[in-house]
Amino acid sequence: MLRSVVLAGGGTAGHVEPALAVADALRAADPRARLTLLGTATGLEARLVPARGYELATVPKVPMPRRPTPALLKLPVRLFDAVRQAGATLDRVRADVVVGFGGYVSVPAYLAARRRGIPIVVHEANPLPGMANRLGARFTPFVATSYPSTPLRGATLTGIPLRAEILSLDRSPAAARAARARYGLDPHRPTLLVFGGSQGARSLNQVMTTAAHSLATAGVQVLHAAGPKNFEEVAAALPRGLPAPYELRPYLDDIMSAYAAADMTLCRSGAMTCAELAAVGLPAAYVPLPHGNGEQRRNALPTVEAGGGLLVEDAALDEDWLLANVLPVLTSAERLAKMSAACAGTGYPQAAAAIVAMVRDAAATRRRSRPRHAAS
């Protein structure tokens, strides 16, 4: 029986959502287990974790400078303090296992757990592991990855754990018609969902303002989340009197309903987005972020190579590309069905269950090597 598990992951949805999905699976498997999420006071977790009914313990954010800067001089003191606070949480909740998902809080969690001999489980959501999980993977044989190419020795491929609501989403024709009606869309038209994350994406917004009329003329309707900062600008740029519905919103507060309404999506290719679209079998035209280490392109490649999506570089995204590549899919029920099946085939619906099993195995090693809790 699991008595107490600490899940460390914060800052971005790519760290927080997998942690919450595993917490949900752990709670379903053992309702008596104490589950504590370790994060920061300012990250996304500060809102999401309490809203999902879990205890949030916090540590200071400790960014790891990638090059010599004055901040590097302060790193040892900041890290020492974060490890001390993480350790205090592990002691307080009498943690049996620490599960880390990368990001700022995982390094102090891994170091504090190792000092106490608490087993560690590492989950890496991206094709290229970050610094935190490269460190954590050195301390444990219990390492889960989301892509076959992830270079962590001895890792088990599990995929990204997702909420049960995503895995059970109904995308039947009847559900699609109902979801479209909730957004004020035509229940029967082919529907393109456009979103660029919580803040939108400028290049996606720009191409939609130029392509909106051509798409509408071809019979395609659009559900478009432009981002709160860009909403007014996009609203002003969209043509008026379109011959098909165009529902523009600042953001989508119910992404699952949007997935149910859509036949295809135009979006960035963050790890969570790719995993969710694969889970629900929703084909996408992926537009990776044009900066960074190429991570978003790698995220989309398995689905694209399987035939479940399209890939276009940010600089190449324009109206001509959209009309030549996305429109023919949206207007062909046969192509949509094939892409949807191919997309769904790249998902990992058992990811959370696989990580729960890994957590149990890790806890068993602790019990065999050093009993922690006296019988009461």
Swiss-Prot record:
Q: What is its EC number?
A: 2.4.1.227
A molecular function (GO) held by this record is: UDP-N-acetyl-D-glucosamine:N-acetylmuramoyl-L-alanyl-D-glutamyl-meso-2,6-diaminopimelyl-D-alanyl-D-alanine-diphosphoundecaprenol 4-beta-N-acetylglucosaminlytransferase activity
Question: Which pathway does it serve?
Answer: Cell wall biogenesis; peptidoglycan biosynthesis
Superkingdom: Bacteria
- Keyword DNA repair among UniProt keywords: no
Query: Cellular component terms, GO, for this chain's entry?
Result: plasma membrane
A Gene Ontology biological process noted in the UniProt record is: lipid glycosylation
**Gene3D superfamilies in UniProt:** Glycogen Phosphorylase B (3.40.50.2000)
Q: Using the UniProt record, name the top-level EC class of this enzyme in a single word.
A: transferase
> Where is the protein situated, by its record's location annotation?
Cell membrane
Coarsely, its chief localization is membrane
Question: Which residue windows are coiled coil?
Answer: none
Instruction: Give the bilayer topology.
Output: Peripheral membrane protein
The entry marks the following residues as binding UDP-N-acetyl-alpha-D-glucosamine, namely 12-14, 126, 163, 198, 296
Query: By its UniProt entry, which HAMAP family does this protein fall under?
Result: MurG
- What family does the Swiss-Prot or TrEMBL record give for this protein? Belongs to the glycosyltransferase 28 family. MurG subfamily.
The job of this chain, per UniProt, is described as: Cell wall formation. Catalyzes the transfer of a GlcNAc subunit on undecaprenyl-pyrophosphoryl-MurNAc-pentapeptide (lipid intermediate I) to form undecaprenyl-pyrophosphoryl-MurNAc-(pentapeptide)GlcNAc (lipid intermediate II).
PANTHER family (UniProt xref): GLYCOSYLTRANSFERASE (PTHR21015:SF22), UDP-N-ACETYLGLUCOSAMINE--N-ACETYLMURAMYL-(PENTAPEPTIDE) PYROPHOSPHORYL-UNDECAPRENOL N-ACETYLGLUCOSAMINE TRANSFERASE 1 (PTHR21015)
What's the protein here called? UDP-N-acetylglucosamine--N-acetylmuramyl-(pentapeptide) pyrophosphoryl-undecaprenol N-acetylglucosamine transferase
* Species of provenance: Frankia alni (strain DSM 45986 / CECT 9034 / ACN14a)
The opening ranks of the lineage are: Bacteria, Bacillati, Actinomycetota, Actinomycetes, Frankiales
Q: What gene is this protein translated from?
A: murG
